[in-house]
């Protein structure tokens, strides 16, 4: 597991260039272009289980699914940021991508790495552990708490995304979306703790 570190206001065009919006829709088409303009090494070197640390307002900008779909497809384990743009936050939950809001952990990691606020850094020297049961992030020897994630978010993540979660829920109810065993309604996606426009 490695850490990719970035600064504030990482927008969706930085995560996935807008020029590919109408030509790349499938995960395998999206992956080679992730962070292409911000960090050209990311798509070539990212590995399943890696974590992204970032500053404020991560995922701001235009509303597109490709950034979230791509990050999930390359195996990003989690994103730890100071805050998220509202639309990105909701899209990430729908795809089953784990987002954690913990400014203190981000600051601690930045201090340990003495990093630039705008350039991605790959590190294996600083140990990072995420404990969902305890709602904590450990950076080196320091542990920081983050707001407890609602059970619905964790269930959607464990299922692999909102679509898979809903399908499994309908199968369990035996309704197939039409019977009386369930409402057939898509669960409401929870909001971020400190949403951005």
Question: Could you say what each language-model-derived stretch is?
Answer:
Residues 1-20, 24, 164-172:
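N-terminal, positively charged, Ser/Thr/Ala/Gly-biased leader segments
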Residues 9, 62, 160-162:
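Conformational gate/switch positions in structured elements
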Residues 14, 29, 33, 91, ...:
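Alpha-helical scaffold segments in soluble metabolic enzymes
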Residues 16, 22-134:
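Feature captures the catalytic cores and cofactor-binding loops of soluble hydro-lyases/lyases
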Residues 119, 125, 136, 184-187, ...:
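A detector of low-complexity, intrinsically disordered, Ser/Thr/Gly/Pro/Ala-rich segments
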Residues 124-172:
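Long, charged alpha-helical interface segments
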Residues 173-197:
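Intrinsic disorder/low-complexity segments
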């Amino acid at each position: 597991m490695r850490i990719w570190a970035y600064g504030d206001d990482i927008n969706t065009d930085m995560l996935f260039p807008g020029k590919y919006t109408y030509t790349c829709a499938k995960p395998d088409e999206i992956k080679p272009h992730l962070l292409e303009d911000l960090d050209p090494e990311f798509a070539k070197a990212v590995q399943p289980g890696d974590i992204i640390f970032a500053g404020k307002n991560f995922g701001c900008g235009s509303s597109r699914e490709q950034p979230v779909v791509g990050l999930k497809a390359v195996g990003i384990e989690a994103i730890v940021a100071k805050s998220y743009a509202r639309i990105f936050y909701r899209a990430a939950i729908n795809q089953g991508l784990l987002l954690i809001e913990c400014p203190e952990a981000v600051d601690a990691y930045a201090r340990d790495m003495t990093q630039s606020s705008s350039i991605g850094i790959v590190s294996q020297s600083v140990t990072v552990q995420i404990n969902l049961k305890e709602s904590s992030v450990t950076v080196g020897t320091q542990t920081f708490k983050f707001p407890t994630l609602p059970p619905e978010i964790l269930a959607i993540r464990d299922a692999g995304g909102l679509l898979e979660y809903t399908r499994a829920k309908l199968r369990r109810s035996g309704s197939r979306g039409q019977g009386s065993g369930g409402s057939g309604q898509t669960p409401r996606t929870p909001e971020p703790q400190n949403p951005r426009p």
